[in-house]
């Protein structure tokens, strides 16, 4: 080739390149293009095709998570990508500016392509891909369309998200949840409108549309808060009757579930404890008795949420009171406390939200009363009614997931056993509690817009009620409170404006060098994971309880407490010469492990009513064990008075939705120690093989402790073999649920009782407060109010079976309501939040079982400006709590 020809060829090549560049074309780089294809769910194992500016095509296949990589060598830009998912055909435009960056394909990139190309339908977009008319689009036009989509999403959220074209994210799959960026894909629909985008209502991807139901209640015969029972009915010691106890209707189960869950969270046992005077359905938002029976009319919508396999799912519910004002919308989350079902927070966050005209977003967070009777192969459905497991399929609230052969073999070896959802789902649902709470908020926005928005000519409903114009408070008590805190940590979309919680079960990831002081005393052990301190308490509480005279519920442990002391001494875990010395030593061990003198008299009732059950459920859930694993020799079953296993009657399962708390023993299902001497027996009556004593299954308790620590608690030897493998699973599960305390500057209130024996403040509230203050630094807006003479179970206070709670303790629920009021005023009106403080209450006193009426003088308010002697301070890594 002569020089003249080479120069002419070069000139033509440069001119061609300039022409291609002017219309967005040009040679692509040899680097691979990569990204994620999703439509809420990952578009897995699907063909993704790229067409270039001159009609060349190249294809690749996405992996199981929707990820792809495509070599662009030789292709001319712009490219148009196309992939077919279960919901449609999706496209993305890629320019030279996108090389080296993530290039996703999803419903958002499809919308961007529509606007960039000036098209009005999906069919037109597919035609553009086929005929190549996209070749004229410029990189600037694509970027402009993407910016307009982000403008619309910012108007929706109140904060600008990352570009869904290029953000790296984790989509949901059939058996795992996606991250918050993935949730945004189906939080709201978008479509081009003029030079920008309109947003419209969309059912979130994770919600099962075929499970969705909605019911309106008139506020008279039935209602949202009291199920038609009113203040008087909730106060009755007699639960509502069933027309046929063997087959209650869904409406009857709902009424009984509301009755039992309300009374389980607040003290409604007697009017002397504050019900009907300080709190309750009849008390208005100003604290006055003006609401009569307190029934609240409105809409209730409910659905399953989770993966498509049905293995990992939670229940979501939204209650919208008739007083809801769409011009001033508000949402309160009410994630269930404990392992309770969907109505588990009805009496706490539910009541507060409904009275304030807010929609209430509930979730059972993947626990609840999911019972599988393995002998009869029956399960409960979403509404609590009973069905055969095969008939229910994945719509069962929970199924153990055993094949017929596996179930038959297990039934033969361990007859009449029960599988329970929180313990045996093999999903470790606690890792998703924050996400479940955020899903409940997203579901609330969907329900509200379905109710209040008006469809346009296309039949779609523009978003009227959005995160940007809605006040959202994450709230609840106990496990629900921990879920609210985790939701706030995970909230990348700005759905939550503030947090106000009570007695949170929250597990700090690490305190590091942080210290906690009460008065002048440094707490020796703090910030331990839940199962760590529970397995420790499970060893020593029965014996320690004997050191505290006048303990409420002491009679419940009388049959095994002394034997527990004796057995611990025999194993070298106590050294006292007699029972009294052993009990004192056991109590000292609890003091050294995070409990304090405020808890001494409550250890008896807690071991009798809570500790072993929580140990067994959480041991199973953290290790993702099956019911067939019988971890540490424990199982669930109905038992006879002598403690032997007996068949569970159909009536037990028929009513479990209403009476169960999600953690056996509950509703007729007890905790059984399979390995007891003489055969399987209820745990509190079990004789341990290694001791020969009826010591409430100490051998099982020691096994549980070993799985948490990784070593034998008696010999100190490291675990090996099967026990080591089980321990590694349990400890991995614990790591999955720990919090990092990064609240991102969200205003947050934590209210806890100093006398909380179940979730000691040194391990939870105090520890989390210190860690979060350290993590967020100057940006922290976390406030902590510690209430003296208050604890975890308000329902114990005036319980006839626990005299002495009433004389010693005040209802923490009063301060939960105050915390909610403070947060609401802060978010709505800019009112200042009081500084962290100790609130010093006065117990009612009097005679155990008949304490005098409580009054406002027993319950001073959270002070706007606390006295110096009551101020809680955090400085230089030390949390200082006044004595």
Where does each model-flagged region fall?
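Bacterial N-terminal signal peptides that target proteins for export
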Residues: 2-11
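General secondary-structure edge motif
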Residues: 3, 129, 133, 137, ...
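C-terminal motif of bacterial Sec signal peptides marking the signal peptidase cleavage site
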Residues: 19-22
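A short acidic-Thr-Gly-centered motif at the start of a beta-strand
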Residues: 24-26, 740
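Feature for extracytoplasmic/surface-facing segments of secreted or surface-associated proteins
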Residues: 26-195
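C-terminal His-loop and adjacent cap/lid subdomain of alpha/beta-hydrolase
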Residues: 194-883
């Amino acid at each position: 080739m002569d020089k003249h020809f080479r120069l002419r060829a070069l000139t033509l090549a440069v001119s061609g390149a300039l022409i291609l560049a002017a219309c967005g074309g040009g040679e692509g780089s040899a680097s691979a293009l990569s990204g994620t294809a999703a439509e809420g769910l990952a578009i897995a194992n699907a063909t993704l095709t790229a067409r270039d500016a001159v009609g060349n095509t190249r294809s690749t296949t996405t992996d199981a998570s929707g990820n792809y990589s495509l070599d662009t060598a030789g292709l001319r830009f712009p490219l148009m990508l196309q992939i077919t998912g279960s919901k449609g055909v999706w496209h993305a435009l890629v320019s030279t500016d996108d090389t080296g960056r993530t290039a996703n394909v999803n419903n958002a990139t499809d919308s961007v392509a529509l606007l960039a190309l000036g098209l009005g339908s999906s069919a037109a977009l597919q035609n553009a891909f086929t005929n190549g008319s996209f070749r004229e689009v410029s990189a600037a036009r694509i970027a402009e369309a993407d910016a307009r989509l982000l403008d619309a999403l910012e108007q929706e959220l109140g904060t600008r998200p990352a570009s869904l074209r290029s953000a790296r994210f984790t989509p949901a799959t059939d058996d795992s949840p996606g991250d918050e960026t993935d949730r945004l894909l189906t939080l709201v629909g978008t479509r081009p409108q003029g030079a920008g985008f309109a947003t419209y209502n969309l059912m979130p991807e994770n919600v099962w549309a075929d499970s969705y139901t909605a019911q309106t209640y008139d506020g008279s015969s039935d209602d949202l808060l009291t199920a038609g029972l009113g203040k008087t009915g909730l106060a009755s010691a007699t639960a509502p009757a069933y027309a046929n106890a063997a087959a209650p209707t869904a409406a009857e189960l709902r009424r009984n579930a509301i009755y039992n869950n309300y009374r389980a969270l607040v003290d409604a046992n007697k009017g002397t404890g504050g019900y009907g005077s300080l709190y309750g359905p009849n008390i208005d938002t100003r604290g006055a008795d003006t609401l009569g029976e307190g029934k609240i009319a409105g809409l209730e919508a409910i659905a399953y949420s989770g993966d498509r396999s049905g293995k990992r799912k939670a229940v979501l519910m939204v209650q919208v009171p008739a007083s809801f004002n769409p011009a001033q919308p508000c949402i309160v989350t009410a994630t269930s406390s404990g392992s309770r079902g969907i109505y588990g927070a009805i009496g706490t966050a539910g009541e507060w939200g409904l009275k304030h005209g807010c929609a209430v977003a509930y979730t059972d967070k993947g626990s609840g009363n999911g019972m599988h009777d393995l002998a009869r192969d029956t399960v409960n459905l979403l509404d609590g009614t009973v069905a055969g497991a095969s008939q229910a399929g994945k719509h069962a609230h929970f199924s153990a997931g055993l094949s017929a052969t596996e179930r038959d073999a297990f039934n033969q070896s361990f007859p009449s056993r029960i599988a329970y959802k929180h313990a045996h789902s093999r999903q470790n649902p606690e890792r998703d509690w924050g996400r479940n709470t955020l899903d409940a908020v997203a579901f609330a926005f969907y329900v509200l817009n379905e109710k209040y928005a008006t469809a346009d000519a296309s039949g779609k409903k523009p978003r009227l009620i959005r995160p940007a114009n809605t006040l959202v408070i994450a709230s609840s008590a106990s496990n629900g409170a921990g879920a609210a805190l985790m939701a706030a940590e995970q909230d990348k979309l700005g759905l939550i404006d503030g947090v106000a919680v009570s007695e949170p079960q929250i597990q700090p990831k690490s305190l590091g060098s942080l210290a906690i002081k009460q008065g002048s005393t440094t707490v020796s052990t703090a910030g331990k994971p839940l199962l760590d301190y529970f397995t420790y308490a499970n060893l020593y509480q029965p014996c320690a309880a004997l050191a505290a005279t006048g303990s409420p519920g002491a009679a419940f442990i009388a049959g095994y407490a002394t034997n527990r002391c004796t057995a611990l001494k025999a194993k070298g875990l106590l050294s006292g010469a007699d029972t009294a010395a052993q009990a004192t030593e056991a109590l000292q061990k609890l003091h050294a492990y995070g409990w304090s003198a405020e808890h001494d008299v409550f250890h008896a009732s807690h071991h009798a009513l809570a500790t072993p059950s929580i140990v067994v459920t959480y041991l199973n859930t953290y290790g993702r064990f099956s019911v067939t694993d019988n971890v540490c020799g424990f199982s669930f079953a109905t038992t006879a008075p002598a403690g032997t296993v007996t068949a569970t009657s159909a009536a037990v399962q028929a009513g479990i939705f209403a009476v169960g708390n999600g953690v056996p023993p509950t509703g007729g299902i007890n905790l059984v120690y399979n390995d007891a001497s003489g055969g399987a027996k209820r745990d509190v009556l079990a004789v341990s093989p290694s001791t020969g004593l009826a010591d409430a299954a100490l051998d099982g308790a020691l096994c549980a402790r070993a799985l948490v620590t990784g070593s034998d608690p008696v010999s100190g030897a490291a675990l090996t073999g099967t026990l080591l493998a089980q321990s590694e699973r349990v400890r991995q599960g614990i790591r999955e649920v720990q919090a990092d305390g990064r609240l991102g500057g969200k205003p947050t209130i934590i209210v806890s009782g100093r006398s909380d024996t179940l979730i000691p403040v040194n391990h939870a509230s105090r520890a989390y407060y210190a860690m979060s203050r350290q993590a967020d630094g100057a940006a922290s807006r976390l406030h902590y109010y510690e209430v003296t003479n208050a604890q975890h179970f308000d329902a114990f206070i005036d319980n006839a079976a626990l005299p002495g709670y009433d004389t010693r303790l005040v209802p923490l629920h009063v301060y939960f309501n105050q915390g909610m009021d403070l947060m609401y005023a802060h978010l709505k009106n800019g009112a200042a939040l009081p500084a962290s403080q100790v609130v010093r209450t006065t117990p009612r006193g009097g005679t155990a079982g008949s304490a005098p009426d409580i009054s406002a003088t027993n319950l001073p308010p959270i002070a706007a400006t606390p006295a110096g002697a009551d101020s809680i301070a955090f400085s230089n890594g030390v949390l200082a709590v006044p004595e």
